[in-house]
Amino acid sequence: MSYFIVFILLIISIYKFDIRNEIRFKKVYFYCILILLIAISAFSYRIGSDTIHYMEEFAERKMQYEYFIINAERQPGWLLLVSLFKLFPHPYYVFKFFFSCFVNTVFLQTIKENTKYVFSAILMYFIFIYFTINFEILREALAVAFFLLSLKFLYKRNFMTYYMLLFCSIMFHVSALCLLFVPLFYLMPQKRSFFYGLLLFIMLGILFDEQLRFLIYHIFYVDIFSEKALYYFEKENFGMTKKNIGIINYFLNLFLPIFMLSCANKQNKLPKYWLCVCAYCIIYGVSIVLPIFFRFNNYFNIFYIFIFIDFISGVNFKKRLSLNSMRLIFVIGLTLFVSFKLKTHFSLIDGKNPSYVRYYPYSSIFDKTRNTKREQVFRYLNN
């Protein structure tokens, strides 16, 4: 019911504020949705496949120095944060409340600052990103949040402040190292030829996948990465998946975002987040060869939402189409995309339980209900 309330409220908000362009009560709706998203995350109980691990980590009553030694593979920022919240009674729940407030506020504020169609973007965030960020990758979610805080400095090319906040990201998750290279896109010409050249470069990487795999393997086979690299590269389920990627996924995740950037550039309306969309496409291309790299797009998925929303909203067609036609395209495009992406929640995760059982039905800390199917998935994923 809690998910349904958020969904209905977002549909109403999209109609009122994104389609009809109403202003009255817009802030009220925005903050009501934010509070609901925070509450759902903060008061959740055993939701998400990594939840048990985090709950156990906070439950360990080790002395601080023992905790640091036992969990030496964790990043320092996370270790310090966990140690701090262990000073409170029920540390995990106190932490989760802080986490939910911080991460969801940062995400929604980023949405507000980067697209005109705020509630459409929040709907896509809720469906495609929210559950992973709030119930799965808590450490990486904090790293993503610090990256999003650095965006306004990146846009202004204030690289000193950008890298200071990036350091905070790395303190929570080593995957944030991929953000070191994002400013390099400013060295590239902002021309259509660059965007199509980028697409060609990615496709060549996919075509010569064995050579790319060999190169990346040896880049990551250094002391600070070797253990994790071996773990991910040698597991069968992280192996080659190029043949399993459908033509629709190629189109949606490679051709479409670059085409949308090209169209925006042609009209001199290249969005300020264009370099993050380019990073998204490169990482998606690499992840076709090495699927584990797909997790790096946790930093950039939100920008795909921005470019998609801005594109189908009619920005690129407004000189040729009527207002009602633009609205129709917007609704149809949003509906088709959401419908296609939603199918991932219905795929079987352990051969018998659909993926959505990790999050539905909802269970709160007030009733502490354990869902049988969810517990089966927990055991399957954590064995």
What is the meaning of each model-derived region?
Residues 47, 52-56, 62-63, 79, ...:
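Alpha-helical transmembrane segments and terminal signal-anchor/GPI-anchor hydrophobic tails
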Residues 52-60, 67-90:
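Short hydrophobic/aromatic helix or loop-helix immediately within or flanking a transmembrane segment
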Residues 76, 88-105:
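Loop-to-helix entry region of an early transmembrane alpha helix in multi-pass inner-membrane enzymes
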Residues 108-128:
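Transmembrane-helix signature of polytopic, membrane-embedded enzymes
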Residues 130, 161-185, 201, 281-285:
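Membrane-interface alpha helices of multi-pass inner-membrane proteins
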Residues 135-141:
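Short acidic/glycine- and proline-prone juxtamembrane loop motifs at membrane-interface regions
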Residues 147-161:
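Membrane-interface transmembrane helices that cradle and orient dolichyl/undecaprenyl
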Residues 317-339:
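Signature aromatic-anchored transmembrane alpha helix within multi-pass, membrane-resident enzymes
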